[in-house]
Amino acid sequence: MAQTLYDKLWNSHVVHTEEDGTALLYIDRQLLHEVTSPQAFEGLKLAQRPVWRISANLAVSDHNVPTTDRSHGIADPVSKLQVDTLDANCDAYGITQFKMNDVRQGIVHIIGPEQGATLPGMTIVCGDSHTSTHGAFGALAHGIGTSEVEHVLATQTLLQKKSKNMLVKVEGQLPRGCTAKDIVLAIIGKIGTAGGTGYAIEFGGSTIRALTMEGRMTVCNMAIEAGARAGMVAVDDTTVEYLKGRPFVPTGAQWDQAVEYWKTFKSDEGAQFDRVVELNAAEIVPQVTWGTSPEMVTSIDGRVPDPEREKDPVKRDAMERALAYMALTPNTPIEAIKVDKIFIGSCTNARIEDIRAAAYVVKKLNRRVAPNVRLAMVVPGSGLVKAQAEREGLDKVFTEAGFEWREPGCSMCLAMNADRLEPGERCASTSNRNFEGRQGQGGRTHLVSPAMAAAAAIEGHFVDIRRLG
């Protein structure tokens, strides 16, 4: 019987299935960070349980670490406590960890793939909702709660119910100026933030196959924003080439065996999906969110929508509340919206490809950050991304134009460290969520691609980067 990619991943990890369909899944890799792991480790200690498979875990501090000078440590006592607690727990249990001043430190969903700890065919979990990122490698990856983190530490298994299968198929050549971020925002705009509820989404089609691994990670990262349990892309030569030579990857004869196995993780011809959604890549244009949900998105050449034209009273009410929070007027051209701050970073868009794309726009415009922009910051996704960008001179491109070049971390994506918006400030952000207060109490977030964020920094408002050539 023909199987989908999700079917193969699920079936190859089932330990036991109950009569109600609940399955005990084996977990190959758990990624840990400082926010959702302390209570899990505390539970182990209280029950006097060991970590079942130490080598299956990899830890890093990312949410609370400062992105400015780290020579004096962490000033905020709560943030410091969380980071110190992770350090102590990993030391006590012998878990591999990249500490704050390790060059390999970075955002958990960036360091996993770049270290080769994320591999095709794996089940991967983390106490973080954007764990779906790792599905770009043909893996089953999703976020879990703190009690589940403890369960995986203790047993290397997890109780789950199988999701339905969805295929999101994107065909054709992506127009100039459009990126993976625009693809996934267009998908969410089409199906809504509840469109993927109850599903695991496989992203396929010629447009997805043409993406780099960085681009595929961006798309899978935001599968959760479409309501899906997980997002994934089939394994191909692009996947294998990315993984070659990375620290956690098999070598020698084991590499050859692994590649042969990895390449089986694709949907079979004739595999049945519960839902299929199709997009024409040629119709995708640079996207900008206007509201307080990722589904509240439109094109750069569009306008802020008018709630009066929405027939559904529930949606109309949500639109009105979003516009009030965002301080936007219906029918305002998107290009007329001015911004106060720029954030280029996050587990969605802080890889070397993203940094290069933003730097290209800055060089092309050849001007400094606009006077009305109070802060434009670039936060690389890891110490290794930062070092690579600096070898290429990209840091100088940004700093000479008036951007701040920071240390790696989650930063302004969720404002758990000192990087945040003040009430009423408007930000062009390459992150994944534009909820009320996400980047700071009263802050107003517009989600865009790195190139779009860079252009907004220089112009002081949103601009159509397709005009840049």
Swiss-Prot record:
Gene3D superfamilies for this protein: Aconitase, domain 3
UniProt remark on cofactor binding: Binds 1 [4Fe-4S] cluster per subunit.
Cofactor: [4Fe-4S] cluster
One GO term (biological process): L-leucine biosynthetic process
Cross-referenced PROSITE patterns: ACONITASE_1, ACONITASE_2
Keyword vocabulary terms for this entry: 4Fe-4S, Amino-acid biosynthesis, Branched-chain amino acid biosynthesis, Iron, Iron-sulfur, Leucine biosynthesis, Lyase, Metal-binding
The organism's place on the tree of life at top rank: Bacteria
Disulphide bridges: none
Subunit comment: Heterodimer of LeuC and LeuD.
NCBIfam families for the chain: leuC, PRK05478.1, PRK12466.1
Function: Catalyzes the isomerization between 2-isopropylmalate and 3-isopropylmalate, via the formation of 2-isopropylmaleate.
Designated name of the protein: 3-isopropylmalate dehydratase large subunit
Gene: leuC
